[in-house]
Each structure stands twice: as C-alpha cells, then as structure tokens.
Amino acid sequence: MFAEYGVLNYWTYLVGAIFIVLVPGPNTLFVLKNSVSSGMKGGYLAACGVFIGDAVLMFLAWAGVATLIKTTPILFNIVRYLGAFYLLYLGSKILYATLKGKNSEAKSDEPQYGAIFKRALILSLTNPKAILFYVSFFVQFIDVNAPHTGISFFILATTLELVSFCYLSFLIISGAFVTQYIRTKKKLAKVGNSLIGLMFVGFAARLATLQS
C-alpha cells in the first residue's frame, strides 16, 4: 500500500505507529488530565495543541532541522532544558494546587480553554527527541530513490497523526466519563492529581538527562 508513493512496508509501519502511540508520555498524560478536569472540550483542545505541535516537528524533521539539532549540541541542549523546565513547571503547578487544596471546583466550572491549548502546544514543541525520532523512524519506511520523498513523508506523518487522534479520542472520552465519578471522590481526585504532578516532574528529570 502506497508503494507507488515511495512508502515501504506500510502495514508494518502502521503496527509500529500504534505501539509507539500507546507508549505513555507527557503529551498523553496532559490530554488525559484535561479531559478529566475540563471535560471533552478541554481534552480535545489539549489534543489539538499536541497535533499541531507534532505536525510542526514532523515538518521540521522533513526540512532537515533534525540534522541541525543532532549536530549542534548547544541547540539540542537549549530545547531540551526548555522542555524539562516546562514539564517541571506543569508538574509543580499541579502538585502545589493539589497540596494547597485550592478551589478546583470553582475553576473547573470555567476552564481556561485557551491556556490548555497553549500549554499542550508548548509541551509538544519543546521535545527535541521527538524531531530526531521522526527522522530515524520514518526513514526506515521511505524509498530514498522515489521521485518525491516529501509525499512519502507526508503519508507516514498523516498516518501517525490519525493513529494518535484515535487513541487520544479514546482517552478523552474515557476521561470525560470518569470526571463525574472523580468529582464525588475528592480524596481519589487529590491522589490522582498528585500522581500526575509527580509524573510530570519525572518526565522533566528524564528529559533533562537525555543525550543527543
């Protein structure tokens, strides 16, 4: 399938893309958190931020920016530390609000949808490993002798985005159903938010220690 467009072993790629999307990460966790705290609208706004951020990174990977980042340690480190700092900021903010026992119910009635989208977009864009991954993964399924490798790259990128959309939609819908139950169990909600905050801090530490 899509062999005429320079795509090699498309079905193998699709299976690989599914497994990759299923691996939990900060983007997935952020979408799930917002679907629980702000409903389906908040979840899909977070997902849109992730999709746009990923699309930008994929385009940059195709444009050759990945090679620049890989061969320029300073640039890689700048993006890496910015991403780690932002993850730490999000995690600390969640933990502070949870431990402080702020009036989350009042805030949940009027979610800041614009802020959700912006945070998801920044979270996606400040992951230097993602752009390097796209190149290393996609290149295995592109015929370098094809006349238009850009089309091949576009097909693979679109497939990955569609798989991600399906999975995130499942999480968003599930999170929206869980919302009503969580709101009646304040202790459970507090524990859940604390775990999410700690996971973001953990993601920050991991990103800060990554090597190019």
UniProtKB/Swiss-Prot annotation:
Q: Where in the cell is it found?
A: Cell inner membrane
An example Pfam family from this entry, by short name, is LysE
Q: What coarse category fits the chief subcellular location reported for this protein?
A: membrane
Q: Which UniProt keywords apply?
A: Amino-acid transport, Antiport, Cell inner membrane, Cell membrane, Membrane, Transmembrane, Transmembrane helix, Transport
Q: What is the membrane topology listed in the Swiss-Prot or TrEMBL record?
A: Multi-pass membrane protein
List the GO molecular function terms.
antiporter activity; L-leucine transmembrane transporter activity
The biological process GO terms on file are:
L-leucine transport
Transmembrane regions? 12-32, 49-69, 71-91, 122-142, 153-173, 188-208
Known catalytic reactions = L-leucine(in) + H(+)(out) = L-leucine(out) + H(+)(in)
* Presence of keyword Transmembrane helix: yes
Give the matching InterPro entries.
LeuE-type
Q: Which GO terms describe its cellular component?
A: plasma membrane
- Does the keyword field hold Transit peptide? no
What protein family does this chain belong to? Belongs to the Rht family.
PANTHER family associated with the record: ARGININE EXPORTER PROTEIN ARGO, LEUCINE EFFLUX PROTEIN
Function of this protein? Exporter of leucine.
What protein does this entry describe? Leucine efflux protein
- Species this chain originates from: Shigella dysenteriae serotype 1 (strain Sd197)
